[in-house]
Amino acid sequence: MQVIATAGHVDHGKSTLVKALTTMEPDRWEEEKRRGLTIDLGFAWTTLPSGENVAFVDVPGHERFLGNMLAGLGPIGLGPAPVLLFVVAADEGWQAQSSDHLDAAVALGIERAVVVLSRADKADAQQRANAAAQVQRELAGTPLAQVPVVEVSAVTGEGVDKLREALDGLVGPEPDPVAAVRLWIDRSFSITGAGTVVTGTLVAGTLRPGDTLSLFQATGVREVEVRGLHSENAAIDLAQPVSRVAVNLRGIDAGTIHRGDVLTTPGKWEAARVIDVRRTTGRNLDVIPQEVVAHLGSAGVGVHVRPFDAQHARLQLPEPLPVVVGDRLILRGPGARHVLAGVEVIDVAPPELNRRGEG
């Protein structure tokens, strides 16, 4: 299975496109359906012409919900070959949140994508050409500069089959099924007769009923047991990467688990509260605010930034997180609706700083 995240400006047709590909409605909340506006993460799945299963994480496009968008994109960005479905309306062209979502994708190092010029039925030939030229200009100089572009109308069906073929062509490296599990939780809820269920994107390792896992939370780390597994609305005996998976946990209340908590293989992940990072994209680290929100996986936590220079800084996390060298984080200002910078972890156990003013 591949897991693909959507991206793009609000009201450019991301959810409508996912529904056209899967026949499933990704918007889960009544308010989303009433307003025609995606607020939180949505999920759907289908089978591509090759027979490969693919799941979609549909993210909100409105700037007010950038944090929710990053919670959907972040776990996929930590996988071996993340894939993006980047949507730009052919009748409107590139917009503000198009740039914000591109900044996030570049910060996470995403290189595999298909750009969709959506709402093709509403655009004349000149508008389509202008939108395609805009996309080329905006993607130039980024890892997504050479990705395929497909014109699609989810209303008439134009281009939908071509889009399926383009998605089928995104072949990446095989994930590691024997790696340690690190499942970033994006939902937690209770089902009558089953109990607590959490969901997330499994990008490495395998899960089986009966497994014991470590649950990283703001309050500490505790052990939990896997009672059962579901994927694509069906019970499974083995979850392998990359896949969307629902994990039924034994002996813990759903209300105590939150987005950004992490299920891991016991003893395989060190908890870090202080990490050193280097800038990969965005603003220099010596000019951003000292207090920012860092997005890693599905978590968004306030961190203190101690810059060493324009390219390097130390981040103080509010609670221990299972972070490894090479992880990519996105930084944004508290309450801000734009990405400040992307950083890569270079040390998860750095030496103490003894210079005056540290802290």
Positions of predicted regions on the chain:
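P-loop/Walker A NTP-binding module and the surrounding RecA-like catalytic core of P-loop NTPases
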Residues: 4-8, 12-20, 64-72, 77, ...
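Conserved G1/Walker A P-loop phosphate-binding module
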Residues: 1-59
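Conserved nucleotide-binding/hydrolysis micro-motifs of P-loop NTPases
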Residues: 62-63, 90-94, 110, 119-124, ...
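Conserved catalytic-core segments of large NTP-driven translation/proteostasis enzymes
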Residues: 120, 137-283
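Conserved catalytic network of the ASCE P-loop NTPase/AAA+ motor domain
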Residues: 10, 37-39, 45-50, 71-80, ...
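Conserved Switch II/interswitch segment of TRAFAC-class P-loop GTPases
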Residues: 52-53, 59-64, 76-102, 106-129
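C-terminal effector modules of nucleic-acid-centric enzymes and ribosome-associated factors
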Residues: 3-6, 122-128, 134-137, 149, ...
